[in-house]
């Protein structure tokens, strides 16, 4: 294994030049073997595929469910990936034949050509097997092309890893000359793309601390670069630089955020399955402990900017929006900075800011119902009728609860400043 293996997975981008090269190489393999070829990265995400070219009728078995889904959605499911990896393709250095298995959705056999570079598997070329299939000489020639694909994937990934490092340097820089230098380096790396409208997406908490588990920007719509950043005391978040068509629309960022949340959910599900298997083994051994619950994640989208100078501020906005989405389900799972209202101010407070002493008694578990009543009352601008309807209670019950809130806190709910203090304290408690 060589030292760059982690970088090969950490971040990658596809320029039009890279994309064209991949397509040409896949077409070359298709011509060599006379069958359509498909190229996927090691995470089973589609990169390129050869068109079906035949003078006869299209064989329906060439479009079995697994192949169709891969082409239409540009990726395979975790179950499909696990099934194919069971044939040893991650360790193989030569062609691997996989028999047809209709119950798995594989109606036609496959030939897998591992795509390697310096001993590291970076992807796979998939061929539909036939009878008679390709000769050994044809497969050897195709493996030569696969080696060229591996070199291209390595170059692409290393270029993308550099972008990820430059982005991270900008987002963690203290400011002043350090920030200026980091921005200049990122601007140089991006070239002409530096001056287009951008925003940042924050996905938090990202379910894995392993950089190898970060997605490739190729698979994230409109993503230019991504990197992992700390989140809270021990967690991690994912920062994604997204290019926009204009500063007036956030649609590309919302699309990217939705895709990343799906990736995060898949990672959480896989982790939960692994934890379940470990727990079952521990139970069998008589040493089972508590099973940690999987933590939900959310995404935040910062405001749009042209150029890179304000990326630090955009990251603060995206992080704040993600925190708001985690605190308030009505914002999530994807929240925009422009839409989070008072949380734009509340998220600027230190994460461990102490509770106001007047409101602290109300925030204990014993008074959860009173706190909820007060929050809904203040959310409805102190209108008793709307509040009672929202809570599904009688007005007299509402008045009784509000009087109890005043007794506990010493605050006067007829006083505007007291209302403001209570409202902000209740909202801030959601961020804790």
Where are these regions (language model features)?
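Short, hinge-like loop/turn segments at secondary-structure boundaries
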Residues: 55-57, 175, 352-353
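Helix N-terminus capping/helix-initiation residues
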Residues: 77-80, 174-175, 356-357
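Cytosolic nucleotide-utilizing catalytic cores of signal-transduction proteins
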Residues: 182, 186-432
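Glycine-rich, aromatic-bearing surface loops/beta-hairpins
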Residues: 159, 166-190
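Intrinsic-disorder-associated interaction segments
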Residues: 18, 73, 156, 160, ...
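Alpha-helical/coil-rich non-catalytic "connector" segments in signaling and regulatory proteins
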Residues: 1-169, 275-288, 368, 373, ...
